[in-house]
């Protein structure tokens, strides 16, 4: 179990003297989050509430029809993401924002005994036990992480090269739980995309240099952990 602790920095007062010139100041405005946390919620635990999935996380693969005359191949795959990576990434992203006094990550998969992947909310007793054991005020649970990849190779006649792209859309779902409350306080469904590309003189060369399936799932799972943060905290 990893903990993230932060110290509050005390800023000294600034001595303002007289000046003869006036500078134009720019002010950055923060946009409100979709979720509002009471001031009493200062310590949060990020937990993995997904079942273990097989090493092969591919759900389904579809070879699609080419959508332009310059396309050589197009393949769409659907995956379960790596929940452990996404949970850790989410905890780190929350900690980096310095919004909460403490962010704790629970590495264990709470649904590790599930045979088939499924969404299952935490019970009131589970939430109470976790918040007490982890000494936190509330929980943010990763409930689901799925992704869709679109792998495409095209010929670029103006440049005389082949261009390979991998575009992955991630769909993380997180829920917020408070102790002594029946069911989650709120569910946040979010999505975003991450992109890779390679160019070369031959189709085979481009295929071999495009990101592998294993690395794609790892990097997309890590990226997915950062996506819900802008819905949870001001930005």
Predicted regions and their residues:
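Soluble periplasmic/extracytoplasmic beta-strand elements of cell-envelope proteins
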Residues: 45-48, 139-143, 169-175
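N-terminal segment of the mature soluble domain
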Residues: 50-141, 145, 181-186
């Amino acid at each position: 179990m990893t903990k993230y602790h932060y110290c509050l920095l005390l800023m000294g007062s600034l001595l303002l003297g007289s000046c003869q010139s006036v500078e134009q100041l720019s002010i950055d405005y923060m946009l409100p989050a979709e979720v509002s946390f009471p001031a009493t919620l200062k310590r949060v635990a990020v937990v993995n509430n997904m079942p273990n999935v097989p090493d092969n996380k591919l759900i389904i693969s579809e070879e699609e029809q080419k959508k332009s005359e310059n396309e050589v191949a197009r393949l769409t795959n659907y995956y379960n993401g790596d929940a452990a990576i996404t949970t850790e990434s989410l905890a780190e992203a929350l900690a980096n924002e310095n919004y909460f006094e403490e962010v704790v990550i629970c590495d264990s998969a709470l649904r590790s005994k599930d045979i088939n992947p499924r969404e299952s909310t935490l019970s009131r007793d589970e939430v109470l036990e976790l918040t007490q054991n982890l000494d936190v005020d509330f929980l943010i649970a990763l409930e689901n992480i799925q992704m869709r990849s679109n792998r495409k190779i095209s010929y670029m006649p103006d440049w005389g090269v082949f261009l390979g792209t991998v575009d992955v859309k991630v769909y993380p779902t997180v829920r917020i739980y408070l102790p002594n409350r029946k069911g989650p306080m709120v569910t946040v469904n979010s999505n975003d995309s991450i992109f890779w590309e390679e160019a070369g003189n031959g189709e085979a060369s481009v295929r071999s240099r495009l990101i592998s399936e294993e690395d794609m799932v790892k990097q997309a799972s890590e990226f997915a952990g950062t996506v819900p943060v802008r819905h949870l905290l001001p930005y």
